Amino acid sequence: IVKNIQKDKVFLENSVIESESIFWTAGIQASPLTQSIDCDKDNLGRIIVKEDCSVPGYENIFAIGDLTNFKPKNNLSKKYETLPGVAQVALQMGKHVSKQIQNDLNNVERKTFNYKDLGEMATIGKSKAVVDIMNLRFGGVIAWLIWLFVHLIAITNFKNKLMIFTQWFWGYLTSQRHSRIIR
């Protein structure tokens, strides 16, 4: 059991681990919303969805994103047993579910959700990020600029892009940590 963490040490009950890098991954749990639906869930409380993102036993209810445990069968990346609870998964699932609802209204057969892995990236400090796209892995300032560009492009309209960019820029100048939050 971890008792305390400092910059370069982790204190356990009977020992100390010294390290230059400490990563805390204490686990996650699905939203309490999932508890209101009587269906199969995994050990994290995520809804186990069917191939079309519908909830078994509730054909007119869909679940997407980090509420779900989706086991891809035909995805190209083959690196996930279940899809991660990240934005690109939720966005792709959302588009898929929108099409499924249209198909239902037009009496068209539902299709299987196929996730397309667009890569991964994360900011890891001021002017620093890591990027893994198409088996290219790199970090630093270039990765950070790519992260900024990709996330600004994903924002829906020019006014929002300008507002977010302005907040990020001000946050960068003033060293505010929350400056990389996307709303």
Where are these regions (language model features)?
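Proline- and acidic/polar-enriched loop/turn elements at helix boundaries
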Residues: 1-2, 35, 46, 165
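Glycine-rich beta-alpha junction loops
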Residues: 2, 21, 25-28, 125-128
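FAD-site-proximal beta/loop scaffold in flavoenzymes
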Residues: 8-93, 99
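C-terminal, flexible cofactor-proximal segment of oxidoreductases
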Residues: 98-183
